[in-house]
Amino acid sequence: MSNNNPKKRPLDAISNTFEVKQEEPEFSSDGFNTTNDDLMSLMTFLDNGTGQQNQQNQQNQQPQPQPQPQPQLPQPQSQQPIYNSNTTTVTVKTEGIATSPLSNASSPISTNNNINNNTNNNNNNNNNNNNNNNNNNNNNNNINTATPPAIGVQQNSNIPYSYPIYTDVTGQQTQHQQNIGQNSVNIDPYFQTIDGAQIQQQQLLQQQLQPIQQVNNPQIDQAQIQQQQAQQIQQQQAQIQAQQAQIQQQQLEQQHLQQQQFQFQQQQQQQQQQQQQQQQQQQQQQQQQQQQQQQQHHQQQQQQQQHQQQQQHQQQQQHQQHQQQQHQQHQQIHQNHQNQLNHQNQLNNQNQLNNQNQLNNQNQLNHQNQLNQPTQPQMQQIELPILHQLPVEPQHLHPIPTHINNNGNNNNNNNNNGSNSSNSSNGIGSPDDIIEPNILSSIQHCNNNNLPLPDHLLINTPYGNVLQPHQQIINECLKLHLAQKEQLDKMKIVQKQVLAHPQKETFQMLDNEQNTLKKQIDAEITSLQQIDQTFVLSPPEIRNVIFLLHELTIQSIQLELYHEELQLLVRPQNPPPTIAALVVIEQPFPMVITKCKPLEDDPVVVQLLCGTRTELQMIGKVRATMIVENQQGSKTSSSPKTIETEVVSMDETNRLAKYHLKFLNGTRKNPVTLKFGMQVQVVGGTAVNIESPPTSPFIVITNECQYEESDGTLLKKDSFGNNNEIPWASYANKLQRHFLRATRQDFMKPTRYLSRHELMYIHHQFFGSKPMIPQSSFDSFWIWFGKGLQKLRYQRHVCSMWQSGLIYGFISRQSVEEALRNEEQGTFLIRFSERHAGHFAVGYKVDDPDPEKRIRHYLVKADDTAGAKKTLPDFLSECPQFTKILQLTIDVSTGEPRLRNFPKDVVLEPYYSKRETLPATNGYDSLPTIL
């Protein structure tokens, strides 16, 4: 072609920096070289826009291969090729290569993808499998990665023309592919449009711009395709082998994990076994330690016992000194107490005079007001409740403090008087409604005996003949009880008048008096309970405390009935309630009763209490019901008839019912109580059943052998109740009470009760001298004490000998040896054995060269007192070695025990059996067996 073509432009217009590097063709050249005609054809094609039509014609001439599914590869966001800043790639069209199967294979980057578009169906299937395997491998193992498409190349098999690849000066291969005839054409930013005039100038650079010769050699293509297929098959096999290896590796890992888990479980089992063995060893060690601790505790107890014995000896010496000091303190306290009484009497007398003057002035004012005003019927005063007349609602019963302050009571009285004087001008009431001032002043005068409780109430001192603080309080409570009884009788008269003709002044005063008296009674009950729990009392003191607690409780019930009746003026009820109560005022319980034996000397007395104006009609008689107490709770006895006389008539005058009980059946060692009930009716009302509180517990036995266990059950219930532990003083007082009943002694004049030394012996021997007695220690004590009490009650002459002091009773072996150490030969002493419950032991003195063997002890056996006609005195009389007996007496001045020796026949002769004396058997010694 000539260089005179007007469309050719010189290549000098191209930038001088454009470097062209001729790239060697990948395949051998077939003699085809790119010419200027080819470039002209390309430019003509671009200018005429017929490239698309020619492309379609060429596609119609060539057989269309059946399209195969191609794997979807991620397309880059930008179709622009990436160029080096120093180079520019120029792509041209080469005719005859656009439809060649190797037209896209000239690029090394897109070789694999172009081959897939030109192979047959089998090759396509293999390639698809390969791509699928590659995708699976990419998803699961991340081993193989699909070859990304070439930068700037669109993977579209329908594009008929493609530009060959040129190589820039850097040696990098780039490919620019675009659809001819489309609206948008990707143009290199450095590419300049070449027209026909410039084609001749481009010939100068043909030698440098040698395109890659693409040879359409079927043999080379087929060999290359087979080689690529073989490589793909190898890759697939390698991938399959890799997957199999991975699966095997996973299986091995799972097996390894299972083995580790199995080993871990075995280790855990071994650890558990080791822990169990360690626990067993620890338990064995703990058991050994407990045994050692028990042994040490036993040794410590023995040491403590020895130490306590020494302390007791020292305490006895200190006690004498302490008594002397207390005697002086008691005298001072008594003087202070008398001074307080005198001062209080003076204050009360002054208050009484002031109250009388105020009442007289008030009565005069009321009388003048009533004369000036017309009289009104009395019923009009009751139509409106007093609540509307009073400025303040009356006081109710409040919790009771332990101490009573007389000054507070006097202030209340003064306040009441002030209210009366202030309200006297209202003109309420009439001359007939005025209460006599003497009655009100007498009620107030009864409160003059209110005494504050002394601060030394909690001092724990043993009882004696010296007047002690708790004895003073008991005496004061006795005086208050008599004064309160008189006060209740006068209060009944006043309340009748108040209910008949209500006045707010007298109502307020009477309500305050009832509240004050209720507080005083509760304070007395509290102080007596504290005395019982703090001091070891003598039998007369025990009797007084029991009597006062019972009487004060009845007074409290009567006062509550009065108060309830008085409050009906403020809170009327329709129909009016039945204000009545049934109480037991006398009872011999707690005690053990023998079946079918009447209680002639110890009757049970029941009294009916009511209000001041309550008119009751007694319907029927009083009925006694036995309530059995067991572990399941209280329930009525199922026996058809357990009491011989269950129903008794009540005296209408005194409203008393007296029972001489006789029980026909035993209670099977279970404690029981009695309740009494009857029907009463208010005039104009309906009948109402009222019932008394239960009596103290008792047990009915059928044989004397049941006494020991039954009395122990009663003592335990009477002492502890629902408590796990109680003070020693309270327990000693309950024990003394049961002991006196068992030995049939009078509380006020006992002949031989448990002395202070005997109680100290019991406290130390069985309870370790602890201030609090646990309920768990009771059974072991009663096993020993109960058998001795059984013998004292039922064995012939034993109880009489006890009361006469011929049986010392509760004393240790060491104390017996000390008592006999300075006595003559043949002197003996009777006591209860410490190791053999219910047996007597005789300690006596003999003539022995060894001083340690001169005091001996003999245990009285059952055969020694066997038979109806052989008693303990008879056994002692038959022993010639027993000549003198030590008799126990109590010093009246100090309360200390004293022993005096008497010839046994002098003191025991009244107890000897009257029978013929048999001659002694010759050749045999009657000396008792030496222990």
Swiss-Prot record:
Residues 1-83, 98-151, 304-340, 396-430 are annotated as: Disordered. Tyrosine phosphorylated in response to the chlorinated hexaphenone DIF. Minimally phosphorylated in the absence of DIF. Phosphorylation increases during development, is highest during the slug stage, with a strong decrease at culmination. One of its GO terms (biological process) is positive regulation of gene expression. Induction: Up-regulated in response to hyperosmotic shock. GO terms for molecular function: DNA-binding transcription factor activity, RNA polymerase II-specific; identical protein binding; protein tyrosine kinase binding; RNA polymerase II cis-regulatory region sequence-specific DNA binding. PROSITE patterns: SH2. Residues 52-63, 111-144, 404-430 have a biased composition (Low complexity). Residues 802-931 form the SH2 domain. Residues 64-74 have a biased composition (Pro residues). The modification Phosphotyrosine is found at residue 924. It is found in: Cytoplasm; Nucleus. Residues 100-110 have a biased composition (Polar residues). One of its GO terms (cellular component) is nucleus. SMART domains: SH2 (SM00252). Residues 6-46 are annotated as: Mediates DIF-inducible nuclear import. It comes from the Eukaryota. Residues 504-554 are annotated as: Mediates nuclear export. Disruption phenotype: Cells display abnormal regulation of gene expression and aberrant timing of development. Colonies growing on a bacterial lawn are smaller, have a rough edge and are surrounded by satellite fruiting bodies. Residues 662-706 bind DNA. The keyword Oxidoreductase does not apply. Residues 471-577 form a coiled coil. Belongs to the transcription factor STAT family. Transcription factor that regulates gene expression during development. May play a role in regulating gene expression in response to osmotic stress. Monomer, in the absence of tyrosine phosphorylation. Homodimer, or heterodimer with another family member, when tyrosine phosphorylated. This is Signal transducer and activator of transcription C. It comes from Dictyostelium discoideum (Social amoeba). The lineage of its organism: Eukaryota, Amoebozoa, Evosea, Eumycetozoa, Dictyostelia. The gene is dstC.
